[in-house]
From Swiss-Prot:
Protein family: Belongs to the BchN/ChlN family.
Keyword Transferase set for record: no
Name used for this protein in its record: Light-independent protochlorophyllide reductase subunit N
Necessary cofactors: [4Fe-4S] cluster
NCBIfam families: DPOR_bchN, PRK02842.1
Binding site for [4Fe-4S] cluster: C22, C47, C107
This protein's pathway: Porphyrin-containing compound metabolism; chlorophyll biosynthesis (light-independent)
Length: 474
């Protein structure tokens, strides 16, 4: 197989990567994001061990998630699934009283054909608590698709758009009442005037989908607000009771590349209009994301180029370190295309982008942006390999000798033993990487192995590393 990097984007498909993180890990960040929720993972002891170890939260700390462990009686159909789940949900209601209970199906529930979707509506009527069913099992391509499944299920529970119009009337009434009172301070009057000027530039409702920490979500909302774009809501909202209203007049835009199932549900089932934009990862991606949203609403952007330039100036110390370095993405979390595009813009050379699954329709804008970035930087286009075979990848890495490999945890130590610097791709999932201000965190993660190597060289250990490298590969 030729390893020459072409001048256009080339797509290949191999036999697949079988060493991936489990999608039920989405519970780790979703239970923190949706504050009034409770996640019930229906699976085996293995799932319980994974949650307890991977999430780093002990069960006796009483987090807002739990395991419904399947036993031999469940698998052999000796126990009544409905009664068992009802008992657990009654206990959850009594102890925690959440606004929603989210059942997470696993591989085992798929294999034994447990009818979670059939039981949920009956139990919901009995308990009076919404029960959302999401099959976040290991049959998906990547562990981040667990969030995609949960958000797609929650999209069905969002209220209709009419409610949104009623809320707008209430907001307008509230603002007129506030203006009426003369005891408002000058600052508050100025703020109210600014808000009314933003609202005066009417545009259809905009809902953003993708789970981000509250601080990052508010940063992106405020960046759009600077451009006179008002965000109507987020999916998921911080509280289940605050889910955004959806309908055929609502525009939706994603913030993560792994939410293709959610995007499809929003378009087909809820009749929303999808804004296909690059994802807000890195200063370049954030600017392109905002520009695309503004162009759809016929709003001219202001001072956006200067804002991006200012961020690049602040990243100068990191850019000097990564410029000219090469990176190889083995593929793990579906963030690879966006991260590769950002690193190319930083001056790095990307040999290959391995990705477990690529939805070319949902990521069309990102792929085009990647191509344009490569052309503007004068860097050859990387090969994109869907479902990469790890054995073939290691052969290619041996020939290309990248400075850094971004890989899943299963391959990190073996690659380090062969003298290749690695970075766990799962760290990019849990880190705050979206928006203008968080670009520094991305480069902090990428440069950590490179800075470690520089420190080792200063200690005179570089010769030992090189000798080991030759021994292992030859």
């Amino acid at each position: 197989m030729s390893n020459k990097i072409s001048e256009t984007l080339t797509f290949e498909c191999e036999t697949g990567n079988y060493h991936t993180f489990c999608p039920i890990s989405c519970v780790a960040w979703l239970y923190q994001k949706i504050e009034d929720s409770f996640f019930l993972v229906v699976g085996t002891k293995t799932c319980g061990y994974f949650l307890q170890n991977a999430l780093g939260v002990m069960i006796f700390a009483e987090p807002r998630y739990a395991m419904a462990e399947l036993e031999e009686g469940d698998i052999s159909a000796q126990l009544n699934d409905y009664k068992e789940l009802k008992r657990l949900c009654l206990q959850i209601k009594k102890d925690r009283n959440p606004s929603v209970i989210i059942w997470i199906g696993t591989c085992t529930t798929e294999i034994i054909k447990m009818d979670l979707e059939g039981m949920a509506p009956k139990l919901e009527n009995e308990l009076g608590i919404p029960i959302v069913v999401a099959r976040a099992n290991g049959l998906d391509y990547a562990f981040t698709q667990g969030e995609d499944t949960v958000l797609a299920a929650m999209a069905h529970r969002c209220p209709e758009q009419n409610t949104l119009l009623d809320n707008k009337k209430v907001i307008q009434q509230d603002s007129t009442i506030q203006d009426f009172f003369s005891f408002l301070s000058l600052e508050k009057k100025e703020e109210t005037r600014n808000n009314s000027s933003i609202k005066s530039k009417k545009h259809p409702p905009l809902v953003l989908f993708g789970s981000l920490p509250s601080t990052v979500a508010s940063q992106l909302s405020s960046e759009l607000k600077r451009q006179s774009v008002q965000v109507s809501g987020w999916l998921p909202a911080q509280r289940y009771t605050d889910l955004p209203s959806l309908g055929d007049q609502v525009y939706v835009c994603g913030v993560n590349p792994f939410l293709s199932r959610t995007a499809t549900t929003l378009m087909r089932r809820r009749k929303c209009k999808l804004i296909g934009a690059p994802f807000p990862i890195g200063p370049d991606g954030t600017r392109a994301w905002i520009e695309k949203i503004c162009s759809v609403f016929n709003i001219k952007t202001k001072d956006l180029e200067q804002r991006e330039q200012q961020i690049w100036e602040n990243l100068k110390d990191y850019l000097d370190l990564v410029r000219g370095k090469s990176v190889f993405f083995m593929g793990d979390n579906l963030l690879e295309i966006s991260l590769a595009r950002f690193l190319i813009r930083c001056g790095m050379i990307v040999y290959e982008i391995g990705i477990p699954y690529l939805d070319k329709r949902y990521q069309a804008a990102e792929l085009l942006f990647l191509q344009n970035t490569c052309k503007s930087m004068g860097i050859p286009m990387p090969r994109i390999v869907e479902k990469p075979d790890n054995y073939n990848q290691i052969q290619r890495m041996r020939e290309l000798q990248p400075d850094l490999a971004i890989t899943g945890m299963a391959h990190a130590n073996p690659l380090e033993a062969r003298g290749i610097n690695t970075k766990w791709s799962v760290e990019f999932t849990f880190a705050q990487i979206h928006g203008f201000t968080n670009a520094r965190d991305v480069l902090e993660l990428v440069t950590r192995p490179l800075r470690r190597n520089n420190n080792l060289e200063n200690l005179g250990w570089n010769d030992l590393t090189k000798k080991e490298k030759q021994i292992k590969f030859n």
